[in-house]
Amino acid sequence: MTDTLADSRTSSRFFTEGVPLVVEDVPRRSAAERAQLLEDPGFGRYFTDSMFVARYRAGEGWHDARLTSYAPLQMDPSAAALHYAQSIFEGLKAYAQPDGSVATFRPEANAARFARGARRLAMPPVPEEAFLTAVDALVDADRDWVPTGPDQTLYIRPYQLASEPFLGVRPAHEYLFIVIASPAGAYFSRGVHPVSVYLSEDYIRAAPGGTGDVKCAGNYAASLLAQEQAIAAGCDQVVWLDALEKKYVEEMGGMNLCFVLGSGDDAELVTPELTGTLLPGITRDSLIEVARAMGHTVTCLLYTSDAADE
């Protein structure tokens, strides 16, 4: 059951220089159906009515940018991303504000990290302003999907993948940049409460010179077996160790690690330093900035698992 179609219009926005943003008519679910889904959205289960799509072709650049209906993608079976994992993604959130507006949290940092990840995988980076335009356009179009309940947000997932139909091992010549959104409750089923962690000694997440500091799809596929081990051991998350000595904690399966030593005004924030093998998290960076602004000592260093266990 849907409401009437959104008005068809020619957007005055441009995705990037010379590339207009086309806004299509999008069927929208009824207010009643949307409200029912927002009562208990979970994480990553439901998706908004729209999505953003732009295409890239070598020699032509980014083109065909549009807001369209959320729908399955049509891809060639030989699309390079399906075979060689030339794919990156980001994750950020939009929050309902008391005055009825919607705010995204530090999207410019996601845009910069997304571009850096693209360059690491030999992909054409999405211009940072274009990334922000795409995110803003989707949130504006689907703002009715931003939940207002406690601990609820609109999770936004931009991603880029190699779409060229070609089986040779080289950087693709064609790409898709897509942004989708999903109303979300707490990431963990128990909500915002302490989680139990499992120290992985059998597997590593990333090695020096690899892709550990970018959000590429292959990093997460390779982490799933260790995550299964953690769940089998009754834990919520994996803690990864460094690849060389397997004694320094780096990060968890879905987030960076921080340790608070001491309490009160004397509390110190300790977090593993960015060695190129762990993700430079935006929440991590925000916590460091806030802690320093509050007068706390912040230390970034190689931190052993023995020290973390004390």
Q: What residues fall within each predicted segment?
A:
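Short, Gly/Pro- and small/polar-rich lid/capping loops
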Residues: 5-67
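Extended Lys/Arg-rich, glycine-bearing segments that form polyanion-binding/interaction patches
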Residues: 14, 40, 107-111, 115-233
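Short acidic-glycine loop/turn motifs at beta-strand connectors
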Residues: 55-62, 95-100, 107, 163, ...
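Short, well-structured beta-strand/strand-turn elements
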Residues: 238, 294-302
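Feature representing long, continuous alpha-helical segments
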Residues: 285-289
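Conserved small/polar residues in nucleotide/adenosyl-binding loops
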Residues: 303-309
